[in-house]
Every structure is written in C-alpha cells, then in structure tokens.
Amino acid sequence: LSLHDALPIYTRVTKKLLNLLALKYELDFSQKEFKSFHSHNEKEILKNLTKDTFTKNVVYCSDAGMPCISDPGASLVDWCIQNEVPYDVIPGANAILTAFAMSGFSSTEFTFFGFLDHKGTSRASKLEEVLNSSRVGILYESPHRLLKLLEELNKKEPDRTIFLVKEISKFYQKTYKNSAKNLYEELKSIEIKGEWVVVVEPKEKFGFNLELDDILPLDIAPKIKARRFLKNTYTNLVLFRI
C-alpha cells in the first residue's frame, strides 16, 4: 500500500511512527500531506471531502489501538460507504482482545462497555450493567478516573475479581489481578499513569434462573414471558406490550 495522504488522529505521533519506518525501510514521507482527523473536527473534514480526495491512497490511522474502537473513524467509514469510495480495514493492535486474553478469566464471552460517563446516573446505571452481566465486562479508563472506578467497584462488589492492565504492548505495561477491595487499597497509594483496560469478572449464576435476555427471544405469548420472568425474579415487574 503506497501512501499519498494521511489522516491521523494527531499528526505528531503518526509522523514519529512514519519517520521510524522511513529510516528502517529507506522510505520518504516528507512530501506527504498530513491532516488531523478527530472528534473535534471530523464534521468539518467530512463536509469538505469529495471523491477526488481519494483518487490516490489515503490512510487513516490512530495514535495507538484501532480506529473506530473507542476512537474516531466510524463517520469516515460511513462517508466512504455512502459515497461508494472503496476502502479496506487493516487490523491493528486492539486492547480489548489483548486484555481479555491476558485476564485469565475462563469465560468465552465478553461485553465491551468502552469508557463510562464521567458522572451522573448514566455512569451509575452502566456500572450496574457491568456488574450484573453474566459475561466478562471490559472497560477503558483514563489514569485520572481509574481510582474513582476502583472505589465504586469496592463499594458495590468488594470481593469481585478485577484484572487491570495499563499501556498494553508498551514499555511500561503492567498488570494487576485481585479483588476490587485489594486493588483499590493498592493503587490509591501510588501515582497512576497511562491508559488502562479494566476487565471485570462476570456475575456468578446460581441454579437455573433465567434472565430477561434469555426470556425475551422465546417464541411464546407475551403473558407467559412475563410470568416466567416474575417467577425467576419475584422482585422485578416487567410490562410487555400485548
């Protein structure tokens, strides 16, 4: 793939990476055009794009990780689809899959929740969803809010096993695996740096209780669905449109 233009999230980091490639493989990127493409300017960039922009190869790349996964990029892909511009996706480093494999949890299913909202009821309800899931839950978190998340996990589920990894595949990569309580006590006494992935042990199931997600797809009358759900929960009332 030859590069004509580049749309990195931030040009400074991408130029560093390309300079390393240029030195190793005797390439020349000095005449290439670089334009930042991120959440703050993507609407303006897309408004000015035309098919002529893509008569030669244009590469969109992220600083780390993979575009469109808790990073900008989906709007650019959609623009290409709507305007019939051919495109390819070349898989890159992905913190979600790497952290899931590193965690040691034996579950074969996981749910990716991205970044939680900074505060408010939406954050609280999403965290409840993570903790009540029967699948491994995976979150991204910044160094400034990691301790807050651990404090919340400690208050709600102090004995829940949590796996943490920071700076995946980088020089300062480090992992932790312990109960929410122990991790909170350990990390509150150190300076937290780097980008983190948080992997949450799934909620343990007892017996054969069905959850709402198990009952809704069943090909039975709505009234029967409601009765089955109430029989399994006793405390939850769910209204089905009949």
PLM features: residue spans?
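Helix-loop-beta element that forms the nucleotide-linked donor phosphate-binding surface
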Residues: 18-27
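Short, small-residue-biased leader/transition segments that mark boundaries at the very start
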Residues: 4-7
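A contiguous loop/helix-start segment that scaffolds small-molecule binding in enzyme catalytic cores
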Residues: 32-33, 56-57, 136, 140-242
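Class I SAM-dependent methyltransferase SAM-binding "motif I" and its flanking Rossmann-like core
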Residues: 75-133
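Short, structured surface patches at the beginning of a domain
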Residues: 19-20, 38-51
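Glycine/small-residue-rich loop that forms an oxyanion/phosphate-binding "nest" at active or ligand-binding sites
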Residues: 45-90, 94
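Conserved helicase motor
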Residues: 34-43, 115-119
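Alpha-helix capping/helix-boundary segments
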Residues: 12-14, 95, 145, 204
